[in-house]
């Protein structure tokens, strides 16, 4: 059975897109060390990212913008990204395994698996692709807006990030529907 593993990164941050990735692994090309991206060092994630995009049978990465997140809400934006991932790889898999407890509204043979990124290697691989891709976006944001410190906090609502929003203002890359950003917009 050919499995498509799907996971996302970036639901909690105040800025940047939510990213979903899907991976179909080549059973003849074993990638050692696949695990939940949150449990790996940045260096290990980068190394595995390269191995996954080189050796996977197929993969895709989808971004949903902060503006779309504000329009839809984060759950619907995440489900939309996952749906797009499956559509991008349509007819290449027999079953979809998604990390978490919610599935998009689709007709694919699928299952949501809580902590799937720690249990299913295809989901682990998707977790790594989504996390590294999103982290790279944050590094680009840091290059464009160095005073905000995106390389350090990756958009999460740290004290430093909130202070920098207060000091320098809300950017287009910020999610304006998120309460901490709304509060700062209304000050």
Swiss-Prot record:
One of its GO terms (biological process) is mismatch repair. The keyword Cell cycle does not apply. The keyword Zinc-finger does not apply. Keywords: Cytoplasm, Endonuclease, Hydrolase, Manganese, Metal-binding, Nuclease. Its cofactor is Mn(2+); Mg(2+). Its EC number is 3.1.26.4. It catalyses: Endonucleolytic cleavage to 5'-phosphomonoester. A divalent metal cation binds at residues 7-8, 99. One of its GO terms (cellular component) is cytoplasm. It is found in: Cytoplasm. GO terms for molecular function: manganese ion binding; RNA binding; RNA-DNA hybrid ribonuclease activity. It comes from the Bacteria. Manganese or magnesium. Binds 1 divalent metal ion per monomer in the absence of substrate. May bind a second metal ion after substrate binding. SUPFAM superfamilies: Ribonuclease H-like (SSF53098). Residues 1-187 form the RNase H type-2 domain. Endonuclease that specifically degrades the RNA of RNA-DNA hybrids. PANTHER family: RIBONUCLEASE H2 SUBUNIT A, RIBONUCLEASE HII. Belongs to the RNase HII family. This is Ribonuclease HII. The gene is rnhB.
């Amino acid at each position: 059975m050919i499995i498509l593993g799907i996971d996302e990164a970036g639901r909690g941050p105040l800025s940047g897109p939510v990213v979903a990735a899907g991976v179909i692994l080549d059973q003849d090309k074993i990638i050692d060390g696949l695990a939940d991206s949150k449990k790996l060092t940045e260096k290990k994630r980068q190394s595995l990212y390269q191995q996954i995009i080189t050796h996977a049978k197929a993969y895709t990465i989808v971004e949903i913008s902060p503006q779309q997140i504000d329009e839809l809400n984060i759950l619907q934006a995440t489900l939309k990204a996952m749906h797009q991932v499956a559509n991008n790889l349509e007819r290449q898999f027999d079953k979809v395994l998604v990390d978490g407890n919610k599935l998009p509204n689709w007709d694919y043979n699928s299952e949501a698996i809580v902590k799937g990124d720690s249990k299913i290697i295809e989901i682990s691989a998707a977790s790594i692709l989504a996390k590294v891709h999103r982290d790279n976006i944050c590094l680009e944001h840091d290059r464009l807006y160095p005073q905000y410190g995106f390389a350090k906090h990756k958009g999460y609502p740290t004290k430093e990030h909130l202070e920098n929003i207060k000091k320098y203002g809300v950017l287009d890359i910020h999610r304006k529907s998120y309460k901490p950003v709304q509060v700062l917009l209304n000050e």
